[in-house]
Amino acid sequence: QPAILRQRRAFLALTGRLALAAGCAPLSWAAGANPRIKAPKKKLLLDTDIGSDIDDAVALAYIVMQPDIDLLGITTATGESVKRAALARQITRQVGLDIPVIPGLEAPRVIAQRQLVAQQAIELPQTVRQTLPRDHNPEAAIDFMVDTIRSNPGEVTLLAVGPFTNIARLLERAPGISKLLHEIVIMGGKYSDYPTPWGPTEWNAIVDPHATSMLFQLAECPIRAIGLDITWRLFMTPEKVRSEFKTHPLLQTVLAWSEVWFKERDLLHFHDPLAAACIVSPDLCTYSQGTVQVDLSNSKTAGITTFTPDPSGLVQIAIDVDPDRFFSTFFTAFSVAART
């Protein structure tokens, strides 16, 4: 048997040299070269304000159903972050996923809170609501992020789909920690004149504008920003949502929560789900590379984002999306899960 192994190694070495001489990729037994061996899952930390816009819950449902994602933990931000963590925990427990879900910071760094409550918490079971702690240590969420990133250097993608209060605190408290990240992906900002109801503003960016500014100033890793000007193109009517979300038990849970949302809205936009899907399938969007500046000059414009093209910049902003491919990618995750 050792002789056979030596012969195989000699054969591989010879074919490798011949392949290189011919300008081809050499044969290999490495995992990445064997089409039957799947690439490792993408390690993910999720920071979310689940409990307000329904798309956070939709994104989390997609993430836990996506076979190519290894969700390491969840942190929550803005008002009633304990209730937001409880909502996230309802989804993870429904699929048997036992991971840390930790409430983080609530108050913006400078301005007054604009997102005080988690409206969808009304859908929490009464037994859960009665046992929620009244107080929490928000720094525990930051501790968890720091420890997880340091334990997985270069492997973790940080997905931020709420106001960036926790992310700014992470970068402030652990200088250089972003160098250990694979990348940061955000749903936030608006980077073009594409028409939306709020002009140049976007909610995640303006709720804590100083945190938004710190994110773009302090991060030392690649950032992919999926802005409102892109996500606004992806939407469904309540009737379409009710029809499509009947197909999977987890989507049925989210559908029940969405009824709170649809009392005040006539569409579901897939803001956060697009950011999540772009982690697995980056080519759902096309991008432009550069830098992002955040306006802090006055209260009316605070949080408005401006993109400047720069080939040396760390930021890639989405500039276009394929809606059909997105919805196919999104619902495929649930149909595959239903068959397994």
Residue ranges: model-predicted function:
Residues P26-K43:
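C-terminal segment of N-terminal export signals and the immediately downstream linker at the start
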Residues Q1-Q7:
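N-terminal secretory signal peptides
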Residues A112-Q115, T196-P197, F235-P238:
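Short, well-ordered secondary-structure micro-motifs
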Residues S81-L87, V110, K190-Y194, Q293-P309:
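Short, mixed-charge aromatic SLiMs
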Residues A39-I50, I54-A86, Q90, T131-T231:
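Active-site histidine-anchored catalytic micro-motif
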Residues P40-L44, K83-S151, G313-D322, F326-S335:
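Metal-dependent C-N hydrolase catalytic cores
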Residues P40-K41, Y62-M65, D70, W203-H210, ...:
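Conformational coupling and interaction surfaces
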Residues R8-C24:
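N-terminal export leaders
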